[in-house]
Amino acid sequence: MLNTYTNSSTKIQGRLSVWLANHKLPHRPLGFDYQGVEILQIRSEDWLSIAVALYVYGFNYLRSQCAYDVAPGGLLASVYHFTKIEDNVDQPEEICIKIFVSRQKPKIPSVFWIWKSADFQERESYDMLGISYENHPRLKRILMPDTWIGWPLRKDYIVPDFYELQDAY
């Protein structure tokens, strides 16, 4: 379970983490990346309400969304990078959100209805890793053929009928 301020002396919390805690929104601070961008972990079931709160807070631009396989047989992660775009600001505020889900039933609420730019990005994560983004209007394969079996970027994926190509010369 994610608790906000349990043992807060061991975690450095950024401005957004403090704001979320003040509004009693569940999250876990994961520190900062090398550029000083705050990273937060959010549970899948809390994601939609937190996403709306982020938009209200001012994060009006979804810069990127990607997903990765944490470990063979382990969790899958969906990562969102948001930016707060404002006039006359040299250094816009940024945030990174990570959502970890089970590979057996990987479901995360879609944020398409908040940030339209999530459309193709969530579809790519679905196509490559099998993460289902609930309430996405067009969640279907975007890179692989509709007949493709499995999720090619999972670490435990085995290519069907794979054979090694030899050098032609």
Swiss-Prot record:
Membrane-related topology note: Peripheral membrane protein
Pfam families cross-referenced by the UniProt entry: Complex1_30kDa
Keywords: Chloroplast, Membrane, NAD, NADP, Plastid, Plastoquinone, Quinone, Thylakoid, Translocase, Transport
Matches recorded under InterPro entries: NADH_DH_suC (IPR010218), NADH_quin_OxRdtase_su_C/D-like (IPR037232), NADH_UbQ_OxRdtase_30kDa_su (IPR001268), NADH_UbQ_OxRdtase_CS (IPR020396)
GO cellular component: chloroplast thylakoid membrane
SUPFAM superfamilies named in the record: Nqo5-like
Quaternary structure note: NDH is composed of at least 16 different subunits, 5 of which are encoded in the nucleus.
Protein name, entry field: NAD(P)H-quinone oxidoreductase subunit J, chloroplastic
